[in-house]
Amino acid sequence: MDLQKDIKKLVTYGLDKKLIMPEDEIYTINQYLEVFRLDEYEDPDIEGEEITGEEIVLPEILDRLTDTAYDRYIIKSDDIVTRDLFDTKLMGILTPKPSQVIKEFRTYYEESPKKATEFFYEFSQDTNYIRRDRVKKDMKWKVNSPYGDIDITINLSKPEKDPKAIAAAKNAKQSSYPKCQLCMENEGYAGRMNHPARQNHRIIPLTINDRKWGFQYSPYVYYNEHCIVFNGQHVPMKIDRAAFTKLFDFVKQFPHYFLGSNADLPIVGGSILT
């Protein structure tokens, strides 16, 4: 019954955050029954309990459900990578299809670009793609220097792998799909020991310089509303006149944001992160 109660709470969270509609409730419960290899379900009495979808509740529910999955041998290991793969699968069941998210984003955009990004940023947190509980652990402070104040940040949102997870990732079958951790192919991907799960990840398509691009948020939030804008095709990074055209094309569409560009040198990366 505790498992059924946690399933009910997770579904109630999805309803509260409008990730699913009331018409989706039974369907969603049945999806979770399949995951946990249950053949039947009795609606538990959870009246009077705090199940309003507050962010502090979600990690607790997911932790308990993941513990149950380990106890029932649904997942074979209890390391952080395996746990993240599993709880992302759970959240993927609650996450609307890409077409639904895009439609809602564009509806908000007609009101204002800012409303559209506010919706999408909140959505990316509600689906646990951006893990609020981990982002809260990040350390940030300012240091005085002869050159002005320097922002120092220690990002703790990205979990450290334990030795077992590192060994499992090393021994995992190598794959070239998705081609990288940012590209379009990640949307909805189940993940593996050496690649994060992205069932709860959604991408907003944009037209930048007459080409298909994607817009998403970083799950690790190095900066406020830290977003990523990326080419729909895998092409080498190149800083030229067209690169500046693309930057300005984006800020014309989203004038409340600013955008930087990675260096076009191998491995260097860069952007505003340097």
Residue ranges of each PLM-predicted region?
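Coil-to-beta-strand transition motifs
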Residues: 222-224, 254-256, 270-271
